[in-house]
Amino acid sequence: MRNVSSPESWAYLSRVVEGPSIHIQEFIANGRSADEIAHGVRTRASWIGALGPQTQNRYTWDQPAQDLARARAAGYTLLTPDSPGWPGENIKPTFHCEYPDDDRKLSLNEEAVAPHALWVKGEADLAKLLAQSVGVVGTRTATQYGRHATDDLVRGLAKHQYTIVSGGALGIDTIAHQAALDCGAPTIVVAACGPGYVYPRSNEPLFDRVVRAGGAIVTEYPPGTTPDRHRFLTRNRLVAGLTQGTLLVEAAFRSGALNTLKWANAMNKQTMAVPGPITATESLGTNLAIQNKQAAMVLNADQIHEHIVHTGDFDAGEQMEMKYPPTLTQQLSHNELRIYDALPRAGEGSRTAEEIAADAGLSIGLAVHILMDLAKRGVVQRERKEWSRTE
């Protein structure tokens, strides 16, 4: 079990190492704590290796107490791998790339690295919020068609208990967040700036509403970090990496939203796109993504759900080699299996939905939704307010 490090050490590393760092992740994987790594950076220890040059210009920016105070003043907390609510199950299998082009694979893998800390405003249990989530992205100059499609798809996804994740930008991002809020679905804004900055400023009321409704604003960047162009590209990898799939609603040929789709493809996530009119410039990027098999064409929320649920939580090669039909549990999605494992066997008692949700680490809304679906399929049974397996 890894030693728990101080928030000050994580805050220091967040300040002096911008964005993802493969070197920090390697140290953590090899048993180094954030306290040790921070001390090594501060003292320029020889063992930090490549982390030395990476922090050469910033290691004296030693202000963790001030950063934590500034974050608190802006309503943010620092979430780390030591924190309850850290979305480890989403992060562990995600941040690596699979690209046939070796040069491109190397380039992507330099940035396809998990965050070492996240600054969060609102609901800090990201593990629960992201357990069933989809990224919804698209152009800043949405057409009426794009607006309508986004609203319709998000409302449909809400019925499947999805958390809607986007970047808070104008256009499709904004519509996705608004639609989620309007129908009571949780939503997460992944920001390209640090606490203390609101970008775009016109969306400040929307972001406040996201937090009040039980969602969250999430960023890798420490307080005062400005929303520069390169940070949007780095932010896109988080939208792709933290969710089970990415939906591209409307995007022109060089739309920045295509960068998020690229990340999702590289991370072997489900990538989906909404087809648009062949005469519409705003849909050229989405149509080409479908044509080039970079995204599956989807027409409604049920199709999106089908793609994500059947991504498979087992290795595809192993599935192909199965000699016999899958067992009941092998047919369950990851979240369904979490619920199933939290249930007593038939004849061995029963549990309330609240107890099951707590044990499974899911929200009560998502847990009840899954229980009802499993009941329809004859997998679980309900006796008054309590549930158990059917076998």
Walk through the language-model features, giving the residues of each.
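N-terminal positively charged helical leader segments and presequences
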Residues: M1-N109
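Glycine-biased, small-residue-rich flexible motifs in mid-sequence functional cores and linkers
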Residues: M1-P7, R15-E18, D82-E391
